[in-house]
Structures are given as structure tokens and as C-alpha cells.
Amino acid sequence: MTILASISSIGNVKSISKSNNVSLSNSSSSLQSMNSIQCGGCGNGGLLGAVGGLVGGVLTGTGVIVGSVLHGVGSILTGGSNNCGCN
């Protein structure tokens, strides 16, 4: 019976990974939002850059939140100083 339980759990893991792939389909929009966040974060403090990253992620879609949060954490650590000079 443990073999059947392990097989059913493997099936559940596969379905979870499929749902994650759907949320990652907005990768191009996440790159665009991260670029705009980097441009807006220049000259602001690290905390302000993090808040802007979170708000931008919520507004553009759920798939973007992960990238925006990661960028926000980077802004807190670096103070957003390396994001100056947007192209």
C-alpha cells in the first residue's frame, strides 16, 4: 500500500509543477516591469525601491510578483544605487 501512496503523491507533484509553469508564462511582462521599476528606483532609497517593486508586481499580474519581490530585496540590500542610468 505504500507503493500506491507514493505513486499518488508523485502524481500530485506533477500537477503542482504544471500550475507553476502557467504562472511563469508572463516572463516577458515581468522583465518589462522590472526594467520600469529599475528606472523609477534611481535616486530613491532601498526601501522605496522595494515598495515600488511590490506594487508593480501586483498591478501587472500574479506571475510578476516573484520577480518584483526578488528585485525589491535586492533594492533593500544595495539601496537601489546600481539602478541609476536607465536606457
From Swiss-Prot:
This is HssA/B-like protein 18. InterPro entries: HssA/B-related. PANTHER family: HSSA/B-LIKE PROTEIN 17-RELATED (PTHR31857), HSSA_B-LIKE PROTEIN 17-RELATED (PTHR31857:SF2). Belongs to the hssA/B family.
